[in-house]
Amino acid sequence: MSYWVELWESIFTPGVTPVLAKSAHVACGALVAVFLGLYIGTKSIHCLILFFLAICLWLSLTWFLVELAHARVNNDLQMSSQSANKNDDNSNNQNPSNNKEMSDKESDSATTTQTFSVPEELLRARTTANNS
């Protein structure tokens, strides 16, 4: 499939697709290069200011894409925990001999926590972003 067709279809796809993210980075890089070239050619302070604004735009775009990725991971974890809880509830409801266990689980549900395996790079990136 053509790059332009993929880009056009990614506009109508919910979320951020790799083609759209790559295109945004290429566009920001081109904008930074143009303003750098204009500054070198004209030595105008205005071009230098626009160059730094373009860099800030690129950094904010990158930050936004990372936050979207974190939100997607958190949403996936939440959905998997909800489906796991529904599966546990369904298995307990099918076995009537576990009524006491089910009531114990319901009473302790506020204090119990579940652990999930999250890739270490995501946790490290999230921790680094929060500490900054």
Curated annotation (Swiss-Prot):
Residue stretches of biased makeup (Low complexity): 80-100
Subcellular location: Endoplasmic reticulum membrane
Biological process according to GO: vacuolar proton-transporting V-type ATPase complex assembly
Record key words, sorted: Endoplasmic reticulum, Membrane, Transmembrane, Transmembrane helix
Protein name: V-type ATPase assembly factor pkr1
Transmembrane segments: 20-40, 48-68
Lumenal-side segments: 41-47
One Pfam family named in its UniProt record: Pkr1
Gene label: pkr1
Main location, first listed in the record: endoplasmic reticulum
The keyword Phosphoprotein is assigned to this record: no
Family the UniProt entry places it in: Belongs to the PKR1 family.
Organism: Schizosaccharomyces pombe (strain 972 / ATCC 24843) (Fission yeast)
InterPro entries: Pkr1
